[in-house]
Amino acid sequence: MYYLKPIGVVEQNENYTVLNIFDEFVEGLDGLKEGDYIIVLVWFHKNDSEEKRKILKVHPRGDINNPLKGVFATRSPYRPNPIGKYTVKIHKIYRNKIFIDKIDAYNETPIIDIKIFSEKLDCPKI
């Protein structure tokens, strides 16, 4: 059995998103700064049900005019493990809050990890 421990939650505001990091993990933010790009992994908790985890084919972007594809070939939130990934720029860090551009995660979406973006590691040469 695997166990994921959320490190914070998403807070949605009108024009931006805040990543609220739980106090016990704030020390892990040391070294991040304004202007850095980070990868944020979240748990799509509103799509987490046994039925939704069994969905393996979807119409991309929810458009029935798009042919069905396997979920691993899409960005669908319906997945066996409903993990979402965002690459975002840090606009400000204040205490336990990271201010970023607006993302489409729901308010209170659990944050399961943050990683610094590395062009060398995250942008394959094609």
UniProtKB/Swiss-Prot annotation:
Pfam families: TrmO_N (PF01980). This is Probable S-adenosyl-L-methionine-binding protein MJ1583. S-adenosyl-L-methionine binds at residues 45-46, 75, 106-109. Keywords: S-adenosyl-L-methionine. It comes from the Archaea. Residues 4-126 form the TsaA-like domain. Belongs to the tRNA methyltransferase O family. Gene3D superfamilies: YaeB-like.
